[in-house]
């Protein structure tokens, strides 16, 4: 690999690089955004219908106080890991799966990119289903056709790259902030604060606090690994990055799940499909206005899902049941967090042990990368295994094991070399 120093401060002069949204090159400093616009983008990415699913999954079998604790612990872990991965993206200027190239090699990148692509497209399709269900109440068109039309609309900003997403997010941020506040206040008012805090379920879908925390982490597991896609456009300032990410996650992934629990109690159902259909009405008192706000929430999140999926695909080819929800979120919380842990270990932890990489961020072509970096891939695989078979909070166990093993395996490999 080349020892050439990278320069993310350079102004890119190739005409097609900006058109390609810097998929394979660092984002130059003069094309980056300040913390306010980054907050708008991050907030809008966080305000997602899936957050209601997180709330209903927790509330369906945990006392509200326990659900609140699980949500708090999970979000603290999420934001801590995300701050590190987004800082890596901001510092290098590279997209998530481009960074992964250096860490795990060519074959490892194929595996990681495929997982992210499938996950992101899955969430994209799920939210299109919600879009179709909501608007079918007001427009005499079938849900599948509405979903297709919604997909075309939401893809229209994603195909324009980060610039298109930033413009939509700037427009949508204030309405979505109001939506979160109204949803929380009105839903809690309808059920009552005392009733909310005294709520105790009859079921046992989630059960333990550890599984509840894993569910919270799993609901945003893909985000931990893909936030460099967004963070690479931020100016490198760890303090502002931290503030922006904490604030965005608080509004979208803390307050909205609480509103989801309160709404589910008021509607007397834990079907998050029903909750998502009516949360807009409960928040605004108007079906149409509520549907428009839900559409904005789905659109601003789905553009990022499609954006990350397309980035992941380029790295490969170079160019309603609540039990189901819990299983999916739990699986994501086991498999994907170690991917983020590999990135953190490689870029932030290994240098502490004297292992310094000479990565040339201006050249991420596969011909300059090893076919596979076994220490990194094995650390990830072992981290997933630890998460599956260990007791406690699986996502944390998997990430910690991955970081430790990544360091150990790389130190051993370096000694042999």
Where are these regions (language model features)?
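Membrane-interface loop-to-helix entry segments
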Residues: 132, 145-150, 154-187, 201-203, ...
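Membrane-interface "cap" regions at the ends of multi-pass membrane proteins
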Residues: 1-60, 64-65, 164, 181, ...
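Hydrophobic transmembrane alpha-helices that form the core helical bundles
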Residues: 109-140, 299-315, 329-330, 338
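Hydrophobic, membrane-embedded alpha-helices of multi-pass small-molecule transporters
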Residues: 33-51, 184-190, 200-263, 281-303, ...
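Extracellular loop-to-transmembrane helix junctions
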Residues: 57-86, 101, 108-110, 250-253, ...
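Membrane-water interface regions at transmembrane-helix termini and the short interhelical loops
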Residues: 57-61, 86-87, 126, 130-138, ...
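C-terminal membrane-solvent junction of multi-pass transporters and transport-like membrane proteins
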Residues: 325, 339-407, 412
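Transmembrane alpha-helical segments of multi-pass small-molecule transport proteins
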Residues: 42, 112-117, 138-160, 174-185, ...
């Amino acid at each position: 690999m080349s020892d050439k120093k990278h320069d993310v401060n350079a102004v890119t002069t190739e005409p097609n690089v900006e058109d390609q949204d810097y998929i394979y090159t660092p984002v130059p400093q003069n094309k980056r955004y300040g913390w306010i616009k980054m907050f708008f983008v991050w907030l809008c990415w966080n305000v997602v219908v899936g957050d209601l699913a997180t709330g209903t999954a927790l509330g369906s079998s945990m006392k509200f106080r326990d659900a609140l604790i699980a949500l708090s612990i999970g979000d603290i872990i999420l934001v801590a890991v995300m701050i590190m991965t987004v800082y890596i993206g901001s510092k290098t200027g590279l997209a998530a799966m481009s960074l992964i190239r250096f860490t795990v090699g060519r074959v490892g990148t194929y595996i990681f990119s495929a997982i992210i692509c499938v996950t992101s497209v899955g969430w994209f399709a799920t939210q299109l289903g919600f879009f179709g269900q909501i608007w079918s109440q007001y427009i005499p068109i079938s849900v599948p056709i509405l979903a297709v039309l919604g997909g075309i609309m939401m893809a229209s900003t994603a195909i324009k790259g980060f610039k298109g997403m930033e413009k939509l997010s700037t427009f949508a941020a204030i309405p979505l902030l109001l939506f979160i506040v109204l949803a929380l206040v009105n839903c809690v008012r309808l059920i009552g604060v005392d009733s909310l805090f005294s709520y105790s379920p009859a079921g046992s879908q989630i059960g333990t606090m550890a599984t509840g925390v894993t569910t919270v982490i799993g609901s945003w597991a893909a985000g931990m690994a893909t936030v460099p896609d967004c963070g690479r456009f931020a100016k490198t300032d760890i303090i502002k990055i931290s503030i922006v990410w904490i604030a965005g996650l608080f509004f979208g992934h803390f307050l909205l799940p609480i509103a989801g629990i309160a709404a589910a109690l008021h509607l007397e159902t834990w079907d998050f499909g029903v909750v998502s259909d009516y949360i807009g009405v409960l928040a605004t008192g108007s079906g149409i206005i509520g549907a428009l706000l839900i559409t904005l929430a789905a659109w601003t999140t789905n553009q990022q899902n499609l954006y990350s999926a397309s980035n992941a695909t380029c790295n490969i080819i170079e160019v309603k049941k609540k039990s189901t929800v819990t299983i999916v979120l739990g699986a994501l919380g086991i498999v994907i967090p170690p991917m983020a842990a590999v990135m953190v270990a490689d870029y932030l932890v290994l240098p502490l042990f004297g292992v310094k990489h000479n990565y040339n961020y201006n050249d991420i072509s596969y011909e300059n990368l090893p076919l596979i970096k076994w220490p990194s891939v094995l650390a990830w695989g072992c981290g997933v295994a630890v998460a599956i078979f260990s007791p406690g909070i699986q996502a944390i166990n998997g990430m910690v094991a991955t970081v430790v093993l990544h360091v150990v395996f790389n130190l051993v490999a370096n000694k042999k070399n």
